[in-house]
Structures are given as C-alpha cells and as structure tokens.
Amino acid sequence: MLIGLFTELNGTGGVQRASRHLAAVLSEFAASRHLDYRLLSLNDTRELHRMSVGGKEFVFTGCERSKARFTATAIRAARRHGKVVLAGHPNLGPVAQAMRIAAPRLRTIICTHGVEVWEPLPAVRRLALGQANVVLAPSQDTANHVAEQHVRRERIRVLPWALDPEFEAIPANAPQGKLPHGYPEGRVILTVGRWLASERYKGMDTLITALPRLLTRWPELQLLAVGDGDDRAWLEELAEKNGVNRHVHFLTGVSFDELAACYQACEMFALPSRGEGFGLVYLEAMARGKPVIGGAHGGAPEVIEDGVTGYLVPHGDAAQLATSIETLLSDQAMAQKMGGRGRQRVEREFRFSVFAKSLKKILREQCES
C-alpha cells in the first residue's frame, strides 16, 4: 500500500496545489503497480472526497482538523502492508515517523515547500526529516535550507513543482477569456496570492509604494491583486497613504477561467517576494506568455531567468522594482519576447508530465528498496 499524508487538498494556495499534484501522481503510480493507496488530508472535511488532476481521478479522506483521527488512521494504514508513505509537508513528518515505528519496513518521503524550512525546525520535525529516506525540495535553494536542518545531502532530491494541467490545456493562441467583474481598465500589473499579515514577505506593499513614481508617466496604470486575506485592510490603507488607492484593486472569489483571463489580459505579472520556495504563480503567468518580476531570493531565481523571461529585484527595493516595471512598460516588443521565452521554458521544463515522470521514478526506487 502507498500512503499519502497532506495538510489540505481542497484549498487554493500553492502548497495545496502542489499537494494535489503529489496525490494524483501517487495514486496513478499505485494503480500502475496494482497496489492499494490511501490518501489522508488533515484539514479537509470528514468525508470521502473525489478529485481530478489532469484527467486522473483519485479519492482521499478528510479528517476535519482532528490530529488524533488523522494519526490513528495513518498508523492503521501503515500496518496494512504499507510500503511507502509520502508526507506532503514537514509538519506531517512526525506522523510519518510514528507510522514507521508501527511498520518498521515502511519507506518515508517528506516534501518541503520553502519558507517553512528557512528557520530551525522543532526537534521532532527535524528528527523526522533527518530519518526520512527521501526529502523532496522544489528548488535547490530550498534543498540548501533542508540540509541546514541536519538532513544528509544524499537524501535530498530536487523536484520542481509543475504547471497545473488546467493551464497546460489552454492553447498559446487562445482568445481572450471573459474577465471577472471588477477587472480595471488601463495597463494592468497582475499579482496573485494570499494577503496575510504573516506573509508580508510576498512584497505586495513594495508594489504599492512603487506606484507613485510609475503613475507620473503612465497615469492609466493599474495594480490588480487577485486573492484575499487578513492584511487586505492594511494594504488598502497603505495605498491610500501613497495616494494610489484608485489604482489598486483587489479581486476575490475568482474562478479558474477568470484567473486565466486575468493572466491573458495583463501587461505583466509581479510578485517581488523574498519567501518563495518555488513560486507556482510565476509558472502560470509565464505559461500565458507574460514577463514576470520576482524577488531575487529563495527559489524564484530558479524559475525566472533575469533579463530573459523577466526580472529579479531585491526584496523591499521599490526603486529597483519601479525601474524593472518601467523597462517592460516602455518596450512592449521586448516584453512580449520575454513572455514568449517564459512560455517556452514552462513547456520545456515545468510540464506536469515532467514532474510526474520524476516523482514516479522516486516512488519506484523506494518501492523496490
């Protein structure tokens, strides 16, 4: 039996999207080897869920935030001829470790994402990482941080996340889709994320403080932030203090088709974050042929080629961010070329099939060990 442990599979964040990809590949691999599989989600509602990624359907059980139920179910699954457990987040590493105590032959794979391993982990999580057979990291930068948690280098594997198959299915020359209500008129800088006070490292505030300089030359410029969170009021207040509140817009409850249309319609995508372990939203924008601006930190430089598919800027440097945006706004032909190169890179390196092939190889190695 193959077992997958996840914090949440129904959510909208990057961790949830990556988790769905992991779950889809694990279930498909199990079927190809005529093995049973069991997928558990800690935070999803207590029922049997059905989900599909890239046309591949899988089922999982939600545990409605009950750590006791989640752990007990995982240990029972391990005792039923468990071969490999894949924990989709370091927070679940201790559960995988408990499963291994109950079923000593069980092989363990733990996935990391980025910022959660940038600081020393609690001892129990660090121990679980150190004793895992494989620790996955979406970028070399994240892998380096994992190694600082006293994980042996030979156990760390870099597995870049993939573009969601829904985005892959959109042709490069697809007509402009229907935009959501509230999409602003003018030249639009798009950013996508969860705007939380605990995640100000995303750099949304820097985008706002860069706007006054840009608006002196392009008064039609608009900043559109797709997503919501507890920091929205603070960001709106910051926009008002900078005199740009009429040029900063938030959209929530956006469907997939509407989000794809936003990527298609915008001039560029910007998320000058210092805390991206990888950055799935960069892939989404690149797949729609848009130049991308990201932070010169974390895993973003492994996705964005500076001066080729977009620009990398130091976190919090509003002047450098404004300069990069000015360059793209001033030369639309160059911006389109950058976007085209980004699309080509996604098609070459970050397709879901590439991710699936790499993960299946790791699963096969662990099953045969």
Model-derived regions: residue spans:
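Conserved donor-binding/catalytic core segment of Leloir-type glycosyltransferases
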Residues: G4, G182-K202, I208-L211
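Short alpha-helical donor nucleotide-sugar binding micro-motif in glycosyltransferases
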Residues: L129, G253-V254, A261-C266
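Carbohydrate-associated surface elements
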Residues: D141, A162
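A short, well-ordered alpha-helix in the C-terminal region of glycosyltransferases
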Residues: E220, Q320, T327, M334-R348, ...
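Nucleotide-activated donor-binding/catalytic signature segment of Leloir-type glycosyltransferases, i.e.
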Residues: A233-V254
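Aromatic "clamp/platform" in nucleotide-sugar-dependent glycosyltransferases that forms part
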Residues: R274
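Short hydrophobic beta-strand element within catalytic cores of glycosyltransferases
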Residues: P291-G294, I304
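Conserved acidic donor-binding segment of nucleotide-sugar-dependent glycosyltransferases
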Residues: D306-G307, Y311-A318, T327-A333
